[in-house]
Amino acid sequence: MPHIVTIGEALVEVMRTELDRPLNRPAPLVGPYPSGAPAIFCSAAARLGASTGFVGTVGQDPFGDCITSRLTDDGVDIMGVRERQDLLTGIAFVAYASDGSRSFCFHMAQAAASQVDWEQIPDGYLDDVRYLHIMGSALSASQSMRQACYRAARHVSANGGTVTLDPNLRPELLPPDQIRAVCQPILDVAGIVLPSGEELTALTGTATPEAGAEHLLANGIDLVALKRGAEGCTLYTAQESVSIDAYQVQEIDPTGAGDCFDAALIVALGEGWSLATAGLFANAVGGLATTERGPMEGAPFRDAVLAFMADQGRPLPGTEDR
């Protein structure tokens, strides 16, 4: 059985090819690309050498094939993936603005992507999981998926695994003022939280990300990994905080970079690396993820990450430093 599992939406993504072209007007699009934050996470972790499994639902259509083929090619276990004949695979349309922001239009609530439930998880699949990664987008898609995530989190925690949470706030799916209530059952059993600054303050009701990290640590979270985009990341524990600068890359498509960061950090921590080394590695993976068009296309293999880090003059420390 896989060591790292995630539950959630599987989508294809179709995106604008030009900046500042809103989705309510005709303009060129490109795609489909396999996507969905939990699926991106699994693909990235598998490419880094981890044993991963994905639980989700696709339609029996070409878009569903696009997703499952990519996951299988990357080595992700898809025993928990269900195909529906009566529903189409979910779709996310994405537009980019020149200020770096994105807007989404999802076909998910009435699509296969949202139809995930506890019963489709194979018996025993979660018993020996080391990390269960939950995304806020999965908690926002449907009641059945939300309840499956809650139940899985309790199960993994009770069996000695670590539950990790990326709030992954999407206002198109969940109003920001509901994020705390929806995420709280996961926070009750989570060990690691991986938010952006905006997500961290929304999640905790604090004025600053730093205060938000302190709040989570005081309430039982072991590690808060604050993703700061082009500025890198800051990792908070009760004992220390470590800030790590980002690697410089030529960004093409930022979608999925945070999911790839999550995957790299969890893979590294699972291998026993130090906090600073894990954060350095995760920054490199997150940066490389932005250098190709398509949310999974830039997810690098481990050898490529190590070569990139060395070429940038910030190599991964030797095993004696981990």
Where does each model-flagged region fall?
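General beta-strand structural signal in soluble alpha/beta enzymes
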Residues: T6-I7, G80, T164-L165, L194-P195, ...
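Glycine-rich phosphate/adenosyl-contacting loop at the front of the ribokinase-like
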Residues: M1-D77, I252, L316, R322
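Conserved N-terminal subdomain of the carbohydrate kinase-like
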Residues: S51-G136, L306-R322
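Conserved phosphate-binding/catalytic region of the ribokinase-like
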Residues: M1-V5, R154-H155, G205-R322
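Conserved beta-alpha-beta core of the PfkB/ribokinase-like small-molecule kinase fold
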Residues: Y131-E214, E231-C233
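Short, conserved phosphate/pyrophosphate- and ester-handling motifs at nucleotide-, phospho-/glycolipid
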Residues: A45, S196, G258
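Hydrophobic anchor at the start of a short beta-strand
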Residues: S51-T52, I78, V163, V224, ...
